[in-house]
Amino acid sequence: MPRIIKNDSIIDDNWQVLTLAEGDTPESLRLPAEPALVPLAVWLARRDELIATQAPLGVWLDSHEGPEALAADSARFAVIGVNFPKFTDGRSYSNARLLRERYHYVGEIRALGDVLQDQLFYMRRCGIDAYALRGDKDIDKALAGLRVFSETYQAAADQPQPLFRRRIAREAA
């Protein structure tokens, strides 16, 4: 079973990530009985069918897809994946932050695709709390990468108060 990092721990991943192969349509994709992350196109085409299954729901966004399509339904999802098709494509950082801050999504946001240790700390800052690393990377070393920085200066999705405000609050207490 594959493993992921979730909430600063390494766990077994029981979610299957479904993709549309060339020639597949959202309507033709076979849905498994076990928990699955479906592409946004499948969710949009088969929303009622997926809701009726009563199984845990998960959807993933490719980097060129925006989270606004999920705004009304975000509370239905146990997991929303954000895909990083390559290291240099940072649009999914924005998608994660929008999910947390604009759409108030409180479930798991999982980084998928070309996910490397160097990115994890910054992904967390944007609200991502689970990471499916690229297959050739060491998950134990990557977990250590989340602990590189002990303090953050700026406000972000994972820490709404900047450092100077946290210091003032500590001194006042």
PLM feature segments, named:
Residues D140-R167:
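C-terminal helical cap(s) of enzyme catalytic domains, especially alpha/beta-barrels
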Residues N14-L61:
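A positional/architectural concept
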Residues V59-L61, P67-A72, Q117-A130:
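Catalytic cores of alpha/beta
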Residues P56-L99:
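Glycine/Thr-rich beta-alpha phosphate-binding loop at enzyme active sites
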Residues C126-R147:
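Glycine-rich phosphate-binding active-site loops on the catalytic face of alpha/beta enzymes
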Residues V42-E49, F87-L99, D140-R147:
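Active-site-adjacent beta->alpha loops and helix N-cap segments on the catalytic face
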Residues P35-L37, P56-G58, F77-G81, E108-R110, ...:
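Structural preference for beta-strand elements that scaffold enzyme active sites
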Residues A52-V59, L98-A111:
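Short beta-strand/loop segments at the ligand-binding rim of alpha/beta enzyme cores
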